[in-house]
Amino acid sequence: MKQESAAPNTPPTSQSPTPSAQFPRNDGDPQALWIFGYGSLVWRPDFAYSDSRVGFVRGYSRRFWQGDTFHRGSDKMPGRVVTLLEDHEGCTWGVAYQVQGEQVSKALKYLNVREAVLGGYDTKEVTFYPQDAPDQPLKALAYVATPQNPGYLGPAPEEAIATQILACRGFSGHNLEYLLRLADFMQLCGPQAQDEHLAAIVDAVGTMLPCFCPTEQALALV
């Protein structure tokens, strides 16, 4: 599978953020940084890290509301990828990665291209609850696409989102692969991990897929 990273002909990168007090730190190791991933980062971080933990953040729901014209779509046919929506009752599962020392600046430089320059995401501090120790929360950095970024598509019926996902492909592969890998991750998290929005899109895709391509091609995509 192609990596979710910059291709050789990508636009010039902006200056990578310099690690400082603006990024969330934890008392146990002030030189370490935790980065929370809830989309493609859960299966393809593509940066060096010291530790990773599955868990969740509260107060946010995951939505396929961000457009993607590079990794999972094109300028003519933007794909649909996830962002976080503030939701008092929401809970989003993902993976937090710990980076230390030289890993910090390298990870931030890489993610600045992948998530900010190419994806339109901004950074936000969140509180991450590890699955194996929810009573020991960690401060983490998350990449969130807000309505102010030019690639933001906003809400749409799950069936419409599914149709768009089935039709789009980018430098990192088919948009459907992105959806199904995220769904696979949620299943591995166990029954306590619920995402009705994601599940509804997967169900809609399952209904529509045979109409988009012959059976053998449909099975190959799944």
UniProtKB/Swiss-Prot annotation:
It is an enzyme of class 4 (lyase). The keyword Lyase applies. Belongs to the gamma-glutamylcyclotransferase family. ChaC subfamily. Substrate binds at I35, F36, G37, Y38, G39, S40. Interacts with NOTCH1 (via extracellular region). Catalyzes the cleavage of glutathione into 5-oxo-L-proline and a Cys-Gly dipeptide. Acts specifically on glutathione, but not on other gamma-glutamyl peptides. Glutathione depletion is an important factor for apoptosis initiation and execution. Acts as a pro-apoptotic component of the unfolded protein response pathway by mediating the pro-apoptotic effects of the ATF4-ATF3-DDIT3/CHOP cascade. Keywords: Apoptosis, Cytoplasm, Golgi apparatus, Lyase, Neurogenesis, Notch signaling pathway, Unfolded protein response. Residues 1-22 have a biased composition (Low complexity). It comes from Homo sapiens. Its EC number is 4.3.2.7. GO terms for cellular component: cytoplasm; cytosol; trans-Golgi network. Residues 1-24 are annotated as: Disordered. Induction: Induced by chemical activators of the unfolded protein response (UPR) such as tunicamycin, DTT and thapsigargin. One of its GO terms (molecular function) is Notch binding. This is Glutathione-specific gamma-glutamylcyclotransferase 1. One of its GO terms (biological process) is Notch signaling pathway. It is found in: Cytoplasm, Cytosol; Golgi apparatus, trans-Golgi network. Pfam families: ChaC. SUPFAM superfamilies: Gamma-glutamyl cyclotransferase-like (SSF110857). The active site is at E115 (proton acceptor). It catalyses: glutathione = L-cysteinylglycine + 5-oxo-L-proline. InterPro entries: ChaC (IPR006840), GGCT-like (IPR013024), GGCT-like_sf (IPR036568).
